[in-house]
Each structure stands twice: as C-alpha cells, then as structure tokens.
Amino acid sequence: MSRRNISKKRFPETDAIYNSYLVSLLISRILKSGKKTIAKKIVYQAFDIIKKKTNEDPLTVFEKAIRNASPIVEVKARRVGGSTYQVPVEVTGFRATNLSLRWIIRYGDQRVGRSMAIKLANEIIDTANDIGNTIKKKEETHKMAEANKAFAHFRY
C-alpha cells in the first residue's frame, strides 16, 4: 500500500443558474469532446422543459429522480479459488449518485426523439415518477444482488 498522502475528493463547482453541484455533475457527464457550453445548453433546456411539463421546480424534480435511481447494493466480481463470484456490495453515496446520473443520461440518450434536451427531460421526469428504463436498471441491479446474496461472505 502506498505511503503517500491520500488525495482529497474534489467536487465540481456549483453551476451558475441553479447553484447546485448535482447539476454541474450532470453537465460534466453530458459533456462530449470538451464542448461544455453545448452541454450546459442541453441541461438548461431540459430543465426548462421539465418546468413546463410538471409545473414544479426542475431542481427538485431532478433531485427526486436522482434519489429514485440511486442503487443501494450492486454486485462486484470477486475471484476466489479459480472461480469468479458476483459478490453483493453496498454502494456508497457518491457512487450511487454517479451511477444514477450515468443511467439517466444513457437511457435518456437511447430514447426516440429530436433533441437530447427533450429526451433528457423526459427521462428525468419518468425517473422522478418511478417509471422508465433507469428504474428498471436499478431494480435489475438489486435483483442481481439479491440472487447472489449467498456469496456475501466473500465481501472484501
């Protein structure tokens, strides 16, 4: 194990409009080829669409979607005695947030629609209402962990 100092966890700065670091995490996940202004435009347009469709604060809808999509347990591959086991492991808070953001963006992008802003807004709204592909992915992850509960003693 390294004797060097442990690096500190760095959080991105909060975004300008909503003053939320979750929104800035979303912007940085949508980012492609370093084009941050386009990513910001997509996110803010999606939030405007959410506001029009739900008549609620888009930040609260987004936070609710993140909470609904965050997994509690996941499986990790662990090699023991020549065979690999899927070991259920609890998910930390930061990783749960990252996974939910990743899933929301992935399944939003896979939706049928014209612009990424519309697709992202619809996925966030569906996730906040506990429906959609993101919630299916979370439930699938939980089912995998439940099915492999017998290997929990291999946890590391």
UniProtKB/Swiss-Prot annotation:
SUPFAM superfamilies assigned? Ribosomal protein S7 (SSF47973)
Q: Which Pfam families match?
A: Ribosomal_S7
Compartment annotation: Plastid, Chloroplast
Q: Which InterPro entries match?
A: Ribosomal_uS7 (IPR000235), Ribosomal_uS7_bac/org-type (IPR005717), Ribosomal_uS7_CS (IPR020606), Ribosomal_uS7_dom (IPR023798), Ribosomal_uS7_dom_sf (IPR036823)
Any one biological process term the GO annotation gives: translation
Q: What keywords tag this UniProt record?
A: Chloroplast, Plastid, Ribonucleoprotein, Ribosomal protein, RNA-binding, rRNA-binding
Mainly localized where? plastid
Which GO terms of the cellular component aspect does the record hold?
chloroplast; small ribosomal subunit
This protein's source sits in the domain of life called Eukaryota
Q: Describe the protein's quaternary organization and the partners it interacts with.
A: Part of the 30S ribosomal subunit.
PANTHER family hit by this protein? RIBOSOMAL PROTEIN S7
Query: What does the function comment of this entry state?
Result: One of the primary rRNA binding proteins, it binds directly to 16S rRNA where it nucleates assembly of the head domain of the 30S subunit.
Q: What is this protein's name?
A: Small ribosomal subunit protein uS7c
Organism, by scientific name, is Phaeodactylum tricornutum (strain CCAP 1055/1)
Recorded name of the encoding gene: rps7
